[in-house]
Amino acid sequence: MAVSVFDLFKIGIGPSSSHTVGPMRAAARFVSRWLDEKGVLTRVARVRGELFGSLAHTGRGHGTDKAVLCGFEGEWPDKIDPDTIPGRLERIRASKNIRLLGRHEIAFDEKSDLIFNKRTKLPYHSNGMRFTAYDTAGNELATRDYYSVGGGFVVNHDEAAEDRIVADTTALPHPFHTGDQLLKACDESGKSIAQVMFENEKAWRSESEIRSGLLTIWKAMQDCVARGMRETGVLPGGLKVQRRAPAMVKDLCDRPEASLKDPLTILDWVNLYALAVNEENAAGGRVVTAPTNGAAGIIPAVLHYYHRFVPGATEQGVLDFLLTAAAIGILYKENASISGAEVGCQGEVGVACSMAAGGLTAALGGSIYQVENAAEIGMEHNLGLTCDPIGGLVQIPCIERNAMGAVKAINAQRMAMRGDGKHRVSLDKVIKTMRDTGRDMQDKYKETSRGGLAVNVIEC
């Protein structure tokens, strides 16, 4: 299995990579591949979607219903304009009609054609969904099961049954599947982790395309932070959460002299960057999965810290950061999970913290062993972290948790670079521990809003 840096860092929309980005991609894939390409689109009289497991329990708060409707109309998360979504949904719901792929209009009653099945779970993952199309006589034209396995990744029933994430067998110059293999590849080639990743990426793209693509990801992160610092108001949903980033940036800019008295003011900026991204995500804005939407603020916040506050920061440093972070993310993707519905928030915020810690260490010139150490520290102290969003919304505790994860990543980098890279717990061991902990964790702590803060804090 070969995973690209651009599989992990994908431009999409909020609030959730597993509950918004993934379902939109799945619905769009169903109508394009199984209706249009099979030549049956014009015969479709009814389309039905059914959501299972975590998608059923927290899907409304995560915008899964909206994502599926947009996907049925042929929209993709990296292309859709978030500002057009409210009008599109209003049209579908008012007319009780939907335009499959934007051109074949059929009747669609959301109450009967999009079911949140909270009693059933599909066999291979908590984030399961089933799409079925019928003709005018009620005969089934096509049906497919899909699983949104975290980070916007989607697999169908057959892929899930074979325990495959992506059917890509591209031969890479430096293949690795574990942290030890990654370090060995670096040792044998004399290359850094970022250089190994860059060489692997060349199996798919030219050098200029890789650089351009990574800088596009970085620009999207910067744009998201800028929007988050600018937009005001209350976030959607019943919690009535007020955006904090605009007031925070105003306070920091209006009182610059305060930073001279407080040596930790830089952390205020790191917090700000993370809050800005995750408030945008909660509002359904454009974000980068890093590696998920729920943890989308950590890597941009730490990368902004590097870009703004580290003397001598360079564009190459940004590229090294992203490539190194992606290599670490691949290890979690292949050997554990980046889905809160599968292993809790340790698989989202924990993984993002680990990726950011390793990426920052690389950008600051750390050795491959210090990078591995920083990544290990970043996860070790997030083990057991639950996913218990209040009201099923990606707001509390998710937004603040990203700020905490970003600060923790910077601290992990500092601890690792004060050492020589030698440590007792390897990254591979902590990844296995995270996977095992996630398997042992009760489902009520895995993005179902049936445990933890979700039941102890009343939604008002």
Predicted features and spans:
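Conserved phosphate/anionic-ligand binding catalytic regions in large, soluble enzymes, centered on
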Residues: 9-27, 283-302, 343-354
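Extended hydrophobic packing segments that form well-structured cores
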Residues: 424-460
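Alpha-helical support elements that line or immediately flank enzyme active sites
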Residues: 18-35, 300-312, 357-365
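Accessory "access/gating" subregions that flank catalytic or transport cores
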Residues: 205-344, 452-460
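Short, mixed-charge aromatic SLiMs
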Residues: 44-59, 91-98, 321-334, 376-389, ...
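Hydrophobic alpha-helical bundle architecture
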Residues: 313, 324, 330-403, 415-424
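C-terminal regulatory domains involved in ligand/effector binding and gene-expression control
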Residues: 77-258
